[in-house]
Amino acid sequence: AQAPGITEAQVKRPFNASSGTRLFQWLARAGLEEAEFRRRYYMTAVTKCYPGKHPKGKGDRKPTGAEQKLCRPFLEREIELVRPRAILAVGGLAIETVLGRKVRLEEAVGQAFEVDGRLVLPLPHPSGASLWLNRPENQACLARALGILKEELLPLIEA
């Protein structure tokens, strides 16, 4: 995720609000139930503080480049300490950060990447503010990604 939302910042639990409901519905399609996922896997965000509402009122504001740069050492240290075999990158900013380059969601979601010896699986952000999933071809990208999660990622991380 790019940053905690207001609810997540208050309760200190990632994907705690409506975006979380949608994300965990997706993960359930791949065989991962929310309670088990939260118990077994580490969740973090590119930035660590709630960035505030988007000026146009559609969701939360994207963290600035300066905010991302300030938080980058913390994210890198988290990855160093956790040493994940795989990373589920949720949302455009998380995907861009983990892959180290800009990439269109249509080109990333539904594909697996290898970065620093880790399997990276991009997912779109589950925010209701995102219109990306309104297109049937993008729903197909998400379905492919969830298939990769079930068939490739889960066996890898549970080995």
Indicate where each model-derived feature is located.
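A polyanion-binding, active-site-adjacent surface
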Residues: 2-158
